[in-house]
Regions:
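Structural preference for solvent-exposed beta-strand-turn elements
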Residues: 1-232
Length: 232
């Protein structure tokens, strides 16, 4: 095991510019697909998962533009097939379930990888999306979701406060028809960050940072876009 030795006794001074938090950046790039107008996410760190996210976006038909530390996305027709090589490299590929289901009408995703924290199943994601009207076919290697018409509002309680499932269902609720209540949700800062981004694009989300999220859905894509700098 590597060791880092720090010798103190010296004063520190100066300033640093913290990069945006990966836990916010990755779901924000997926959430940008829900916007009907161009979006920009700034302060993006040069991480492997960010590069994988850009590859995923290009694979489904998006055209992300990376300029310095800013990623820009404009609405384009999308397909719902996530390549196995991309999904297997990054746990955050699960964030694209709801956006691609909404944009393409169907999404097929090989089971995601990239996680060193042990198995983290996606059953809450799938159960919540099924409650909103999606049909779910889950196999040993991949999962396929389809919808007929817009997703519908629900009053849904998460089995446990999963951050990923909270983000997935929040994105779905923002574009569903009607007024959705999500109970027992995660309260991490990235939930608040993604909610702020979606609200800037025209969503109506309240309660981020509390155990209950309420959302008045747009019944389709959000009407606007947003420029957003994620939390550090």
């Amino acid at each position: 095991m590597e060791t880092i030795a720090i010798t103190g006794g010296r004063g520190l001074q100066g300033c640093i510019r913290p990069a945006a938090a990966k836990n916010s950046v990755l779901p924000l790039l997926a959430a940008a697909l829900l916007c009907g107008e161009p979006c920009a996410v700034s302060g993006v760190p040069p991480l492997a998962d960010v590069a994988t996210s850009l590859a995923l976006l290009r694979a489904v038909g998006a055209a992300p533009e990376l300029q310095g530390d800013t990623i820009r996305l404009a609405p384009r027709p999308l397909c719902g097939d996530i390549p196995p090589a991309v999904a297997g490299a990054m746990r955050a590929s699960v964030f694209y379930l709801a956006p691609l289901l909404i944009r393409a009408g169907a999404v097929t995703m090989p089971l995601p990888g990239g996680c060193r924290l042990g198995p983290r199943p996606i059953d809450i994601h799938l159960d919540g999306l099924a409650a909103m009207g999606a049909s779910v076919q889950a196999g040993a290697q991949a999962v396929t979701l389809r919808r007929r018409g817009a997703l519908h509002a629900v009053d849904y309680t998460l089995r446990l406060p999963s951050v990923g499932a909270t983000l997935t269902l929040l994105m779905a609720a923002a574009c569903a028809e009607g007024y959705t209540t999500l109970r027992g949700v995660a309260r991490e800062p990235e939930i608040q960050d993604v909610a702020a981004f979606l609200n800037a694009a025209g969503a109506e989300i309240a309660g981020a940072g509390t155990p209950v999220l309420t959302t008045r859905g747009a019944g389709g894509l959000l009407p606007g876009g947003a420029r957003h700098t994620p939390l550090p």
